[in-house]
Amino acid sequence: MSTELSAAPGRVRPFRLLAALAVSVVAITASNAGLTVIGKVVFSAPDDFCAFLPQNSVPMTLEAVALAATAWGLLNHYSPRPAWWFYQGARVFVAVSWLLSLLALATWRSVLGVVTLDIMLVVGATVIYLAMTRIAPTVRVTTA
């Protein structure tokens, strides 16, 4: 039995991937709820800031986590360095989201509301990355 890591792509256990997906959704929804309270109370963001409404944030969270879980599974199957590529994808997602936040500022949205939304995005990307790479790690199959 070989103890060397294979450079070949691996796979993810489906149950662990579903567990990572569930943990991500619960953690992000809870953090979004907490950050919504902070955004409204501490930063005095307006109540009509649509990103803070659960009927908007929860479906978007589900879509983002499902997309990330799919990407994680595909990267594990086709890439020899899935965690690195997943990290790069998370960085691009956050950067593009911040650029889109500038559009929200251009429509005269509350600056502190947009900052709170940006914090939500960073927390969400971090939770997804850690859940996928720690709960559903890559299993490498080596041939002897």
Predicted features along the sequence, with ranges:
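Internal alpha-helical transmembrane segments of multi-pass membrane proteins
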Residues: 17, 73, 77-95
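Aromatic-anchored segments of alpha-helical transmembrane domains
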Residues: 29-30, 92-103
